[in-house]
Amino acid sequence: MPLNPSEQPIQVFFSYSHKDEALRDELSTHLAVLKRQRLIREWHDRQIPAGDVWKEAIDDRINEAGVILLLISADFLASDYCHEIEMKRALERHEKREAVVIPIILRPCNWQGSPFGKLQALPKDARPVTTWPNRDEAFTNISEGIRRAIERLQ
């Protein structure tokens, strides 16, 4: 039985570098309980149907999202599209309180001076996922943090 029967699931948008796709998939697996409980529905650009205009699809989804996850790595920071388009729009929506932006530190990189550097990051202590001895523990910590953010939105 869904824990959220009367509420619509909150749209979660993944902003990430395609070089981090495997880590995005691992995170998605750890969010399965939140999806089954109808607390969230997730979206990323690999879900764009053939023939759709990808920039419009991304713009629409980032503007609909209640939670925007920035999956941080050196590749994310090096991506002009992630940095200049997705992250910029995400932070605009965050500042207007239209969405919650959560940085997820996937791999070690110099992110602290970035525009999102003032936001509380996950996992615990902003320790990069790939540095945890057990990645499942890192992704569980992230999933719990996302659940708490979702509960605050309801």
Question: What kind of feature is each model-predicted range?
Answer:
Residues 1-71, 90-100, 105-107, 137-154:
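Conserved N-terminal substructure of TIR/SEFIR domains
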Residues 17, 48, 76-80, 132:
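Short, charged/polar micro-motifs that form catalytic or ligand-binding hotspots
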Residues 71-72, 124:
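Short loop/turn segments at strand-loop or loop-helix junctions that form parts
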Residues 21-23, 77-79, 110-114:
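Short catalytic/ligand-binding loop motif for oxyanion handling, primarily in non-cytosolic enzymes
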Residues 74-96:
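Conserved TIR/SEFIR loop-to-helix hotspot centered on a Trp-containing motif
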Residues 109-124:
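Glycine-rich, charge-decorated loop segments at or immediately adjacent to ligand/cofactor-binding or catalytic sites
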